[in-house]
Amino acid sequence: MPRSRINGNFIDKTSSIVANILLRIIPTTSGEKKAFTYYRDGMSAQSEGNYAEALQNYYEATRPEIDPYDRSYILYNIGLIHTSNGEHTKALEYYFRALERNPFLPQAFNNMAVICHYRGEQAILQGDSEIAEAWFDQAAEYWKQAIALTPGNYIEAHNWLKITRRFE
C-alpha cells in the first residue's frame, strides 16, 4: 500500500488528498506523477524517521524525474538523510548535485557549511589547526553563499562570520 494511504494524522491525510487531486487535475506525464508519488512517500517516511524507506523512495523518484528544479529537491532530501546518518561525504555529494540543478538552494549551502564547520571542529580536537582553518574557510564560503541568497536568514552563521573575521 502506498505510504500516502497509510499516513495517520489529519494534516498528512489532507495533504495526501490535495496532492492526489492536483495530480489528477494538473496536466502531468505518467513519469512526473510517479516521481511525485515517490517523493511524497519519501517525505512522509523521512518525517517519521524511517530513513531507509525514505531513501528508497527518493532514489525511485530520481529515475522518472527529469525536471532539474524538482530533481534538486529530491537530491537535497537525500543529502539531509545522509547528514542525519552521519555520512557527511555522501551528504556533501548530494548537496552538490542538488546545487548543480538548482543554484538557489540556500539550505543546501547552509548544510554544507555546517558539515565543514563540524569537520573543522573535529580537526581541532585532533590537534590539526591548519586543516581546521581550511574547513572553517570552506564553511565561511558556503555560509556567505547561503546568506547572499537569503539576506536576513542564518543569523548565527552571519555572527560567526563576523566574529571570526571571515565576513567581507
Swiss-Prot record:
Membrane-protein topology: Peripheral membrane protein
InterPro entries reported for this sequence: PSI_Ycf3_assembly, TPR-like_helical_dom_sf, TPR_rpt, Ycf3/AcsC/BcsC/TPR_MFPF
PROSITE patterns: TPR (PS50005), TPR_REGION (PS50293)
Keyword Repeat appears in the UniProt entry: yes
Keyword entries, A-Z: Chloroplast, Membrane, Photosynthesis, Plastid, Repeat, Thylakoid, TPR repeat
Localization (cell): Plastid, Chloroplast thylakoid membrane
Ranges of the TPR repeats in the UniProt entry: 35-68, 72-105, 120-153
Signal peptide location: none
Biological process, per Gene Ontology: photosynthesis
Main location: plastid
Top-level taxon of origin: Eukaryota
Pfam families: TPR_1 (PF00515)
Family affiliation: Belongs to the Ycf3 family.
Functional note: Essential for the assembly of the photosystem I (PSI) complex. May act as a chaperone-like factor to guide the assembly of the PSI subunits.
HAMAP family given in the database record: Ycf3
The protein's name in its UniProt record: Photosystem I assembly protein Ycf3
Protein source organism: Phalaenopsis aphrodite subsp. formosana (Moth orchid)
Gene this protein is translated from: ycf3
